[in-house]
């Protein structure tokens, strides 16, 4: 066990991150597609608790994000928690704030600790976009004469702006037009995301984050262990530049290559109060210093991080000049580019290990995943303060400020 933090560095109600884990991110219908979102969630929670050296029996509450809940069964967060060995007596709540669900879960967990309601809480998010069903909306009334309409549950509940009746990618095009961000700039950013992600993978920086996942390959055949983000292995810069626009045929700039990919994955964080960290002698990786939400018109969600981030930094009692690294979820390359422009960010300090364009974007997972990755960036680059933000459908965004506390590896030395 790592040495305990000194009592002069923590206040009793400080929110401390003592364990983190994420699964590798699997491609759509790819390496993790045989596992449900709740199973992926269980794997991440179990690993985070093990790395934190926290007995599951000590957990008081679980907040876990999940967006595409159809066909998962009742209370997905509870399924994930019980599957990780957390007792029946623990309260579990599933959070759906679209793409920000995982981060909002961490924010709610933090509030419960700050208010003195809890001392040990697990938070995070999960998604298996590969397993989202398609709907027969008229079947309940009876399927009579004629053809039936099949509705894609993933599009309907995850990727569609219900207010304007168009796909999320159209919002990316609106953003690109408004801020005059070209196709070439978006492609260059996407290539950079892949290059940074591949570099982090090749230098084992993601090993600190990832819990390997064992996947069955069928009866009588040995299982395989997935320990790398699947999307990074399919990078082809030349092909990326030739892809056609996906959402705007004439003059469009958002493509499948410079947008995030449909993916599967889960991420979890173990949060404890400063008082409990001292009592149990836990290794504190980071403190949560502040957080905030923001919202504007639904079709403008792409730039809402630029509203949420300053609010979170102010609530943390910091100045933007003190922030070492940022993570802004790459729903589309244009999202990172627009918010970088609006906030005047140094490109070298934004998404330093790649992002959703290269790694993938499992909706309910991503808000938690970027927090785990931000901690990895701060650890690798010896930063102190980091800010993560993620936009969400409907016009919103969430942001959270972390203070990195230690350069020591959490959990086992293998990490």
UniProtKB/Swiss-Prot annotation:
> Localized where?
Cytoplasm; Peroxisome
Residues bound to K(+) are 256, 357
Where does the source fall among the domains of life? Answer: Eukaryota
Q: What happens when the gene is disrupted?
A: No visible phenotype under normal growth and stress growth conditions.
Please name the CDD domains in this protein's record.
thiolase
Q: In which pathway does it act?
A: Metabolic intermediate biosynthesis; (R)-mevalonate biosynthesis; (R)-mevalonate from acetyl-CoA: step 1/3
Q: Which SUPFAM superfamilies match?
A: Thiolase-like (SSF53901)
Chief site of localization: cytoplasm
Which residues are the active-site ones?
99, 361, 391
Q: Which GO CC terms are listed, alphabetically?
A: peroxisome
Query: According to its UniProt record, which reaction does this protein catalyse?
Result: 2 acetyl-CoA = acetoacetyl-CoA + CoA
What InterPro entries would the database entry show? Thiolase (IPR002155), Thiolase-like (IPR016039), Thiolase_AS (IPR020610), Thiolase_C (IPR020617), Thiolase_CS (IPR020613), Thiolase_N (IPR020616)
Matches recorded under Pfam families: Thiolase_C (PF02803), Thiolase_N (PF00108)
Q: What GO molecular functions are on record for this protein?
A: acetyl-CoA C-acetyltransferase activity; metal ion binding
Q: Which UniProt keywords apply?
A: Acyltransferase, Cytoplasm, Metal-binding, Peroxisome, Potassium, Transferase
Reported tissue expression: Expressed in the vascular system of roots, cotyledons, young leaves, fully expanded leaves, stems, flowers, and funiculi of siliques.
Residues annotated to bind CoA = 239, 260
Q: Return the Gene3D superfamilies for the record.
A: 3.40.47.10
E.C. designation(s): 2.3.1.9
The family database entries (NCBIfam families) matched by this protein are listed as: AcCoA-C-Actrans
The function of this protein is: Catalyzes the condensation of two molecules of acetyl-CoA to produce acetoacetyl-CoA.
Q: Which family does it belong to?
A: Belongs to the thiolase-like superfamily. Thiolase family.
Listed name of the protein: Acetyl-CoA acetyltransferase 1
Q: Which organism is it from?
A: Arabidopsis thaliana (Mouse-ear cress)
Gene that encodes the chain: ACCT1
């Amino acid at each position: 066990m790592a040495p305990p933090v000194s009592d002069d560095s923590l206040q009793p109600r400080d929110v401390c991150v003592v364990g983190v884990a994420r699964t590798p991110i699997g491609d759509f219908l790819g390496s993790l597609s045989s596992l449900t979102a709740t199973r992926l969630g269980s794997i991440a929670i179990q690993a985070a608790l093990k790395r934190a050296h926290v007995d599951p029996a000590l957990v008081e509450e679980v907040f876990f994000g999940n967006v595409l809940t159809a066909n998962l069964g009742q209370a997905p967060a509870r399924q994930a928690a019980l599957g990780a060995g957390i007792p029946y007596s623990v309260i579990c709540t599933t959070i759906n704030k679209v793409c920000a669900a995982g981060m909002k879960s961490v924010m709610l967990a933090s509030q419960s600790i700050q208010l003195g309601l809890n001392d040990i809480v697990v938070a995070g998010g999960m998604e298996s976009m590969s397993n989202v069903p398609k709907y027969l909306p008229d079947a309940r009334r009876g399927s009579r004469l004629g053809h039936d309409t099949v509705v894609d549950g993933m599009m309907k509940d995850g990727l569609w702006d219900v207010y304007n009746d168009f796909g999320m990618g159209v919002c990316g095009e609106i953003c690109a037009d408004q801020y005059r961000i070209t196709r070439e700039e978006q492609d260059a950013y996407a290539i950079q995301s892949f290059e940074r992600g591949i570099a982090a993978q090749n230098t084992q920086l993601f090993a600190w984050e990832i819990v390997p996942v064992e996947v069955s390959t069928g009866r009588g055949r040995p299982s395989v262990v997935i320990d790398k983000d699947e999307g990074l292995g399919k990078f082809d810069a030349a092909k990326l530049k030739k892809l056609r626009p996906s959402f705007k045929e004439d003059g469009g700039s958002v493509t499948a290559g410079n947008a995030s990919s449909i993916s599967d994955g889960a991420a979890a964080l173990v949060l404890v109060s400063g008082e409990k960290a001292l009592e149990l002698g836990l290794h504190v990786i980071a403190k949560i210093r502040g957080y905030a939400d923001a919202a504007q018109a639904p079709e403008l969600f792409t730039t809402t991080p630029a509203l949420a981030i300053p609010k979170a930094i102010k609530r943390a009692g910091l100045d933007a000049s003190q922030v070492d690294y940022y993570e802004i979820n790459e729903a589309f390359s244009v999202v990172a580019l627009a918010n970088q422009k609006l906030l005047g960010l140094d490109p070298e300090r934004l998404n330093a290990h790649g992002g959703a364009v290269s790694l993938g974007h499992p909706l309910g997972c991503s808000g938690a995943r970027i927090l785990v990755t931000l901690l990895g960036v701060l650890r690798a680059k010896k930063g102190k303060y980091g800010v993560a933000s993620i936009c969400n459908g409907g016009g919103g965004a969430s942001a959270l400020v972390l203070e990195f506390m230690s350069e020591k590896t959490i959990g086992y030395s293998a990490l």
